[in-house]
């Protein structure tokens, strides 16, 4: 076997007949497969053992030689070599064709490569190949042009006139002869000359032909090899024939297709031997051609060959194509051993880094490890004995299993794996039952819930795999979300509710105002029922030993509540005592107002003091998230995960103690609801009157009515939330962020409000009832539209979002951090992203975690805030914005010079760890996942603004697709191509508006539709590329008008606009990586003296290389313009043919690659996965491969810490 890790590139080309014969182990002469009685392969047939190897290990066909000792011998009776039966997966055969046959990929593909090379139309080629016309190969004295087509009658006529003096042939033979006669160098010279003079269609064709001719010259492929004389037969194990239960056989479609070819070929041979009449031979040759076409690509020409039940047979091309093809089904995703799946259940008592594995599952997964251990401990005598012990589930097996799984992490995966947090490592603990136990805090990252979700378990086997799983993938390490660098592990539902309830304060709670010496006293009083969780008390501040308390404060009494004392137990000691849910309290110190000197307490005690003070808000979900982020910023990951576990335990404990329930009595209907409705009803009547009098249009009336009812709902909502008791369970759920929001509550107790019709428009008749009162039949009916649309949308969105992620991953999979610094001299100017006055992404968020390109000084003090190539941390970013600086140049992926990737400096910090990014990080894939994963949260709809045509703006997922596919947007904006002043705006024909721009040298006018809103007015100055009307810009046009930098910034802004409007935060750097991939090609305008072809798409780096060469040799450089490719197109244009072929249009990509003799340097991730090599990212990079692991190395500290710390 070849060691896949040892080769550096893979090349593809056309196979010569000699090459095909050299692969083959023998010629298949008969169409038979296996003997129906003996079930043994027929000699010389499609499964022949002599050609392909024995069907049983170390045994020849007739049984003369059995056993491994005869290895390598060839049986003298049956001629079969004694070897492993596995060779039947590798050995190929061949068929010697009686007549040459054209390869359908090269003749029928678009464009037809054969046609371009011969300068013949595909239709003419088809007529010749399928024996409808003759082609003139050698015109002789006939006066005919070479390659002219002749019908049967014309050929007879010329043949009679010039017998034996000219040659015209039919079928692939004629084409082969023409291909053999082609002089590529002469053709090249002729085409280069034609390029100088040709224009229009002729120029386009000349460029296409030049590309094909150049391909053949460079690749060393012979054009005649596009015609087959010998047909290879793939190994029999890859097209198997298996016996079914009923004695019948199931076989691969390929065997049928091969059988047809062999039958027709044998018949043709016989006819040629017999000297049959020409017309019969011709017909047989045509049938052979069709049989080979069907084998290579069934259905490409004419009707496909069908099997039983009119099902088209799957040809060799279909074996590669699509989701079920070889690439996507077997090479990019394989099923793996040492894996299992089961339903998940919650494991509230687990630590952050643990999961619960069902005993019987663990027994099966770790079987080989247990067997080894049983033999080593001498519990079992040998492996076989150990196996039977495990299968019997003997008692001693369980102890061994406990030891084996200790410190052996397993990977848990939930489908769909939308981002890298969809697979995480945990340390298994054994549990009873058959469900996998999952840590409740890990559910957010997996997007899992416990309503029947299933998860898969995988066991990393090698020491390196285990180390990687533990160091990089342990759930306790993955606290931050790679898309925005915020904690993804936040408490939810019960945990939030528990902590909210714990930190609640109540006025009339038992024994309010009691003063305690220390925490222990408080806990004892609480345990004995002397105080309640919500009781406000005083505690001597000194007893907390808190480093943030001043000396003065330590002499005072801290005013807090019992619950908060308990909550602060889980917070690290160096933090301020958290008494109120504010950033100041969290980051700096406990506010002074919560300290009271003993002398200040009046005679009535603290109770009277507390009665005057307002209650402090309890801690909600957002605040808990801030606490986690703050702990993460100040401490190690280990400390954070320990605190998270404590927070989870507190939450569960106190939400159970709270016993929060919901009853119908908790839903209190607003008393003055009817008055609010009547008031708004009057407003609607007023608007309708105005419309009836013709004072406003129907469009304005509709919008006004919608606005009135929205206002009514808002008013009811505000009054409802204000009138609710703070201890109302439903209010507590929504206020804490555990579940539900104000809108849900309004629907229960207030009114349901406006609903959408099936078309997406809003129905102006609101639903005035609430669920508590009950809906009328009409109201119920209206509301079903929205519910149905919601479900349908979700289903569509999931598929669309998944496909978007796949395309994004494909285009960016080879972007890896490849070096520390690329040394670029350019940077990206960043400032606030705004849409009108609305802030989309603030400046501070854009610079944090990036490297500066310039020295930034304080405008007043001139002090240096940040130096060039220095990382802008959160503190520095705050300093910059506090200094009033509103824009700066940063290092960006847009301006990075690294080939096939980015450098550390241009990328910035790794958001998943908060540290600087390391060489080897697969940032392209992370970027694709970060943009694709929130795709399901985006809306599907195109907003209809009251049904006016032309003003629909695409938003949500469709808009993201539109941007990344570089499509012409819906509701396109008009942009100006010149700088100048708006001279005039007038009405043109067909109710269009004409905008006239007067520049320095020229005046241009632009037409906009009558309904589009203008963004400029007469006399206004405009820059090149400025928007004249509302809408989205067409990016390809913008690129040619405003240039590369403006287009990059525009695309970045547009993507951020869509996501931020939906409340999804994605870091700029992810979008930058993707947009850069879309702009990495240029189109050659003039080739100069370089080897580049005019009109061809070339990678920017190859273009600069070619020009550098030209400058060195004092030659004319090439000129080119940047091209914006959509992600699908960009994936197919990638350097790697393996990656492109596994993505889409497999046959087209492979045809092209074979003719060009392309070489795949295996730089990306996909191509390495396909050939089974370690991926060149992370520890798979060559610079890390030479590192040997030390077998006796002591375990790292962090791991020890995770293991031994009890919480």
Swiss-Prot record:
Binding site for Zn(2+) 1: 60, 62, 75, 78
Catalytic activity: RNA(n) + a ribonucleoside 5'-triphosphate = RNA(n+1) + diphosphate
Record InterPro entries: DNA-dir_RpoC_beta_prime, DNA-dir_RpoC_beta_prime_bact, RNA_pol_asu, RNA_pol_N, RNA_pol_Rpb1_1, RNA_pol_Rpb1_3, RNA_pol_Rpb1_3_sf, RNA_pol_Rpb1_4
Cofactors that this protein relies on: Mg(2+); Zn(2+)
GO BP annotations listed: DNA-templated transcription
Entry binding sites for Zn(2+) 2: 822, 896, 903, 906
Keyword Nucleotidyltransferase in record: yes
Keywords assigned: DNA-directed RNA polymerase, Magnesium, Metal-binding, Nucleotidyltransferase, Transcription, Transferase, Zinc
Molecular function terms, GO-annotated: DNA binding; DNA-directed RNA polymerase activity; magnesium ion binding; zinc ion binding
EC class name: transferase
Chain sites annotated for binding Mg(2+): 449, 451, 453
E.C. designation(s): 2.7.7.6
Cofactor note: Binds 1 Mg(2+) ion per subunit. Binds 2 Zn(2+) ions per subunit.
GO cellular component assignments: DNA-directed RNA polymerase complex
Keyword Cell wall biogenesis/degradation in record: no
Family recorded in the similarity comment: Belongs to the RNA polymerase beta' chain family.
Binding partners and assembly: The RNAP catalytic core consists of 2 alpha, 1 beta, 1 beta' and 1 omega subunit. When a sigma factor is associated with the core the holoenzyme is formed, which can initiate transcription.
Family matches, as NCBIfam families: rpoC_TIGR
Record function comment: DNA-dependent RNA polymerase catalyzes the transcription of DNA into RNA using the four ribonucleoside triphosphates as substrates.
Protein name (record): DNA-directed RNA polymerase subunit beta'
Taxonomic lineage from the root: Bacteria, Bacillati, Bacillota, Bacilli, Bacillales
């Amino acid at each position: 076997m070849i060691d896949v890790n040892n080769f550096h590139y893979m090349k593809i080309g056309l196979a010569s007949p000699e090459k095909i014969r050299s692969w083959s182990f023998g010629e298949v002469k008969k169409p038979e497969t296996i003997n129906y009685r003996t079930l043994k392969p027929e000699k010389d047939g499609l499964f022949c053992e002599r050609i392909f190897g024995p069907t049983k290990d170390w045994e020849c066909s007739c049984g003369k030689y059995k056993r491994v000792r005869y290895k390598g011998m060839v049986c003298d009776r049956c001629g079969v070599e004694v070897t492993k039966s596995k060779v039947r997966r590798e050995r190929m055969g061949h068929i010697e064709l009686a007549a040459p046959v054209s390869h359908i990929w090269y003749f029928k593909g678009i464009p037809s490569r054969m046609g371009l090379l011969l300068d013949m139309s595909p239709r003419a080629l088809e007529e010749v190949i399928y024996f409808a016309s003759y082609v003139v190969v050698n015109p002789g004295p006939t006066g005919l042009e070479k390659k002219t087509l002749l019908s049967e009658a014309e050929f007879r006529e010329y043949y009679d006139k010039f017998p034996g003096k000219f040659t015209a042939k039919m079928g692939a033979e004629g084409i082969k002869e023409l291909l053999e006669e082609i002089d590529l160098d002469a053709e090249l010279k002729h085409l280069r000359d034609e390029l100088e003079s040709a224009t229009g269609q002729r120029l386009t064709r000349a460029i296409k032909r030049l590309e094909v001719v150049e391909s053949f010259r460079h690749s060393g492929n012979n054009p005649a090899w596009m015609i087959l004389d010998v047909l290879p037969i793939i190994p029999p194990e890859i097209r198997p024939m298996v016996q079914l239960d009923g004695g019948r056989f199931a076989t691969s479609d390929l065997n049928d297709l091969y059988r047809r070819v062999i039958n027709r070929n044998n018949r043709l041979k016989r006819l040629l031997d017999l000297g049959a009449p020409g017309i019969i031979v011709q017909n047989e040759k045509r049938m052979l051609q069709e049989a080979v076409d069907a084998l290579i690509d069934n259905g490409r020409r004419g009707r496909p060959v069908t099997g039983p039940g009119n099902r088209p047979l799957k040809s060799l091309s279909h074996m590669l194509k699509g989701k079920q093809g070889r690439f996507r089904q077997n090479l990019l995703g394989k099923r793996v051993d040492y894996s299992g799946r089961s339903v998940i259940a919650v494991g509230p008592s687990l630590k952050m880094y643990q999961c619960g594995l069902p005993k019987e599952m663990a027994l099966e997964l770790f079987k080989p490890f247990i067997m080894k251990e049983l033999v080593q401990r001498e519990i079992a005598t040998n492996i076989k004995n150990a196996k039977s012990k495990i299968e019997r589930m003997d008692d001693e097996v369980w102890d061994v299993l406990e030891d084996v799984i200790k410190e052996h992490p397993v990977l848990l995966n939930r489908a769909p794996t939308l981002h890298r947090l969809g697979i995480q490592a945990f340390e298994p603990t054994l549990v009873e039952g058959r469900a996998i136990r999952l840590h409740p805090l890990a559910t957010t990252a997996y997007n899992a819930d416990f309503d029947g979700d299933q998860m898969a378990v995988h066991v990393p086997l090698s020491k390196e795999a285990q180390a990687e799983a533990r160091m990089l993938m342990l759930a306790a390490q993955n606290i931050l979300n790679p898309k925005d660098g915020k904690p993804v592990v936040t408490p939810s539902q019960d945990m939030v509710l528990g902590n909210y309830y714990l930190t609640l304060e109540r006025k009339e709670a038992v024994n309010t105002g009691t003063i305690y010496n220390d925490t222990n006293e408080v806990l004892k009083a609480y345990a004995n029922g002397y105080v309640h969780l919500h009781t406000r008390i005083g505690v001597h501040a000194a007893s907390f030993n808190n480093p943030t308390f001043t000396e003065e404060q330590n002499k005072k009494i801290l005013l807090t509540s019992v619950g908060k004392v308990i909550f602060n137990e889980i917070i690290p000691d160096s933090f301020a005592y958290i008494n109120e849910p504010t950033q100041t309290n969290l980051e700096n110190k406990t506010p002074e107002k919560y300290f009271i000197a003993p002398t200040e307490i009046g005679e009535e005690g603290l109770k009277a003091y507390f009665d005057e003070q307002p209650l402090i808000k309890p801690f909600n979900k957002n605040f808990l998230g801030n606490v986690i982020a703050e702990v993460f910023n100040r401490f190690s990951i280990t400390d954070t995960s320990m605190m998270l576990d404590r927070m989870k335990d507190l939450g569960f404990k106190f939400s159970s103690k709270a016993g929060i329930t919901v009853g119908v009595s908790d839903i209190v209907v607003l008393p003055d609801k009817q008055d609010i409705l009547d008031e708004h009803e009057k407003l609607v009547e007023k608007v309708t009157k105005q419309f009836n009098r013709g004072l406003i249009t129907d469009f304005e009336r509709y919008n006004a009515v919608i606005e009135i009812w929205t206002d009514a709902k808002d008013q009811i909502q505000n009054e409802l939330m204000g009138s609710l008791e703070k201890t109302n369970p439903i209010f507590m759920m929504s206020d804490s962020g555990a579940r539900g929001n104000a809108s849900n509550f309004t629907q229960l107790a207030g009114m349901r409000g406006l609903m959408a019709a099936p078309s997406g428009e809003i129905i102006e008749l609101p639903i005035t009832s609430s669920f508590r009162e009950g809906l009328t039949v009409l109201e119920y009916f209206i509301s079903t539209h929205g519910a149905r649309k919601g479900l349908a949308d979700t289903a569509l969105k999931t598929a669309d979002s998944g496909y978007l992620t796949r395309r994004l991953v494909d285009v960016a999979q080879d972007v890896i951090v490849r070096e520390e610094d690329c040394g670029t001299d350019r940077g990206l100017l960043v400032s606030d992203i705004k849409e009108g006055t609305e802030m989309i992404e603030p400046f501070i968020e854009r610079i944090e975690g990036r490297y500066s390109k310039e020295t930034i000084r304080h405008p007043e003090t001139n002090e240096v805030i940040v130096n060039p190539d220095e990382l802008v941390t959160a503190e520095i970013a705050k300093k910059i914005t506090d200094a009033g600086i509103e824009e700066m140049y940063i290092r960006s992926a847009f301006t990075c010079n690294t080939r096939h990737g980015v450098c550390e400096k241009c990328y910035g910090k790794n958001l998943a760890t908060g540290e600087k990014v390391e060489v080897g990080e697969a940032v392209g894939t992370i970027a694709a996942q970060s943009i694709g994963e929130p795709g399901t949260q985006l809306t599907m709809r195109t907003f209809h603004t009251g049904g006016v045509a032309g003003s629909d703006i695409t938003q949500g997922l469709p808009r993201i697709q539109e941007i990344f596919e570089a499509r012409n947007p819906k509701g396109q904006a008009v942009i100006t191509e010149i700088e100048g002043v708006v001279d005039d705006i007038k009405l043109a024909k067909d109710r269009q508006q004409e905008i006239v721009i007067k520049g320095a040298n020229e005046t241009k006018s632009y037409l906009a539709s009558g309904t589009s809103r203008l963004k400029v007015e007469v006399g206004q100055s405009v820059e090149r590329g400025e928007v004249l009307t509302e809408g989205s810009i067409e990016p390809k046009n913008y690129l040619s008008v405003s240039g590369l930098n403006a287009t990059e910034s525009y695309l970045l802004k547009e993507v951020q606009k869509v996501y931020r409007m939906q409340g999804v935060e994605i870091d700029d750097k992810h979008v930058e990586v993707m947009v850069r991939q879309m702009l990495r090609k240029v189109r050659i305008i003039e080739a100069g003296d370089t080897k580049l072809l005019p009109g061809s798409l070339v990678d920017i780096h190859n273009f600069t290389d070619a020009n550098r060469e030209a400058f060195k040799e004092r030659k004319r450089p090439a000129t080119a313009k940047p091209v914006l490719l959509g992600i699908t197109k960009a994936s197919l244009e990638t350097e790697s043919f393996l990656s492109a072929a596994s993505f889409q249009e497999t046959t087209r990509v492979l045809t092209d690659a074979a003719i060009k003799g392309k070489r795949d340097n295996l730089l990306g991730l996909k191509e390495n996965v396909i050939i089974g090599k370690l991926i060149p990212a992370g520890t798979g990079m060559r610079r890390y491969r030479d590192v040997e692991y030390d077998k006796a190395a002591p375990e790292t500290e962090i791991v020890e810490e995770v293991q031994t710390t009890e919480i």
